[in-house]
Structure formats: C-alpha cells, structure tokens
C-alpha cells in the first residue's frame, strides 16, 4: 500500500507539524441541523438562521441564495435576505412522477439556469430548467432499488458524465449522460468486516454518501457507515485512506460530505458520531494531520449530513 496518493506531490518535513491542536483558520459555513438552517461565522457565532427540516444536499449560489431540499422530494432556492423560497421544483409531482414513490437526496445547479436532480424511487437523473421543463433524463442502473437509498450525492463531471454515490448498492458509478451506460464503477469494500446495523459508530457497512473526482483522475469516496474516506485510481486501487480511529481523539461515524480545498486539504462530514466528536473535520491528506474541526453538537445535534464552507477563495471540489 502506498503512503501517499499520486495526486499529492507535497514534501513533508516532520518538524513542521508539531502542534497538538488544529492550526488552520476557522471557517464560515452554512449548515442544517436540529430543525434549523444556519450560517455560522468563523468565530462560531450564528449570524443567520431560519427553521428548516433535514437535508442531504446543499449549494450556495452565486447570487447569494442557497439551494436545499425541502421535505423528501422538493428542491428549493431560498433568498437569504428575506428567508423566502423564490424557486422550487417538486419531483413528487412533476414530469410524470405524480403518484409514484420518489425521494430526492442529490441535486446540483448547472450553467444556464439548469438544475440536475437525482430521483430515487423512479431511478433516474433529470435536468430541468427554471420553468420545470424536462430537458434530459437518464435511467440509473440499480441492483437493489430503494426509494430512500437509490442515491446519496450525485455530481456532474466536467466531461458531462454523472458521478453517482448509489448507497443501497454500495457502489460508485460513473454514467455517460448521453447513453446511460456505466463507464466506470467501484464497489466500496467491507475490509473483511461484517455488516452491522445502526447509524452511529457502532454500525458498519458500505452505504456510501459521496464521491468526487480529483484533478488527477482518482476518485475520493466518503463511505457512509464504512466510517472512512478512501481514494481509488481508475484501476480501482486504493492509494489513500483514513478509517474510524485513525485521527487522534476523533471517532468517525457516518462519513458524509467531501470538500477538496484549493490547498489540497479535505473537509469531511462526520454525521451521527455523538457528543464529543466534530461534525466537520479538515485534514491535510499528505500527513493526515487534523488542522480544523467544527464541533457544534449542542447547537445542531447528531444528524448533520451536509454543509458548505463559504469563505474559501478559489475552486472547491464538492
């Protein structure tokens, strides 16, 4: 097993990493938990909030609005200044889905006002315009169809393909958007362990939550109840990994979101981990040194599946 991914050319000198506590600046972010959507300042103060139910995906928009899910099947855009929903799309009703079991756990705003939406249950990925017109649709390959768990996060790649975290199948699949064919897939390993039920640190499985494509072509995967993040090559070789107890003083539980920052750091979502564990962890993948954590369990509770940093200059992969 390689010590460092081929994506990273960082030279590490042990004498540079002696601090026992996180040393990076804190982040401003938007997050949902305990029945509220909130913007948290870098100093930890809540600078904005409104009542809002649970989410699995979130996107800060260039106009200063935020796009989130509302309920099980609706995508909504909120004007932060007024706290009003200024646009929405209900997958339970639109474009042939009326009367069908549908849940939405992933979506993404695209260029020209298009929105990509992954519809679990009916098993498709669609793109719509802001009038709700169906512009494209593509069927998902599903080994174990599930209205609640067909997908977690889905992202459209620069080449136009879809990278899909298919939770119930335990697989990442990359689809050619034009043909619907799977052009690459990876089954998240169980690492020789038996599946265990639950949502917290005691659980185990390969019900992944997110996958992002790195600039070098490797894929970074948040394994959900696998309590880990792994990086795999196009040839499906694991070249980097961090597991449940690899980070001192931190227990990973349901590992959800991934943000790859311009400085190559990873920000990892740590859901259902219980009090005493951070909700977000920023680490340097070259050293696995934790450089920042977000620990607001008392404010946001034990179910914080998604968030987004708001103060990072440059392109973030998420």
Q: What would you call each of these model-derived segments?
A:
Residues 1-6:
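N-terminal secretory signal peptides that target proteins for export/translocation
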Residues 24-318:
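Histidine-/acidic-rich catalytic cores in large beta-rich domains
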Residues 7-20:
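Bacterial N-terminal signal peptides
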């Amino acid at each position: 097993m390689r010590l460092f991914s081929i994506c990273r050319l960082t030279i590490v000198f042990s004498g540079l990493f002696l601090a026992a506590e996180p040393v990076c600046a804190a982040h401003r972010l938007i997050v949902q938990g305990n029945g509220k959507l909130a913007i948290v300042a870098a100093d930890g103060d809540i600078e904005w909030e409104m009542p809002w139910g649970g989410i699995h995906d979130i996107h800060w928009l260039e106009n200063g609005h935020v796009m989130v899910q509302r309920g099980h099947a609706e995508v909504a855009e909120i004007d932060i200044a007024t706290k009003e929903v200024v646009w929405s799309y209900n997958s339970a009703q639109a474009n042939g889905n009326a009367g069908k079991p549908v849940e939405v756990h992933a979506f993404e705003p695209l260029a020209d006002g298009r929105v990509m939406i992954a519809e679990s249950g009916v098993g498709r990925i669609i793109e719509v315009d802001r009038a709700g017109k169906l512009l494209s649709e593509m069927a998902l390959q599903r080994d174990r169809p599930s209205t609640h768990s067909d997908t977690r996060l889905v992202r459209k790649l620069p080449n136009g393909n879809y990278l899909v975290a298919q939770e119930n199948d335990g697989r990442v699949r990359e689809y050619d958007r034009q043909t619907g064919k799977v052009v690459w897939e990876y089954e998240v390993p169980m690492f020789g362990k038996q599946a265990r039920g639950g949502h917290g640190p005691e659980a185990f499985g390969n019900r992944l939550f997110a996958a992002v494509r790195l600039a070098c072509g490797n894929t970074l995967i948040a394994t959900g109840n696998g309590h880990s993040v792994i990086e795999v090559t196009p040839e499906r070789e694991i070249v980097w990994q961090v597991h449940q107890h690899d980070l001192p003083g931190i227990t990973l539980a349901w590992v959800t979101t991934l943000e790859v920052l311009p400085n190559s750091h990873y920000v990892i979502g740590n859901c259902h981990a219980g009090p005493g564990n951070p909700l977000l962890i920023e680490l340097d993948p070259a050293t696995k040194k934790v450089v920042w954590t977000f620990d607001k369990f008392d404010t946001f509770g034990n179910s914080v599946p998604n968030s987004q940093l708001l103060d990072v200059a440059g392109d973030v992969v998420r």
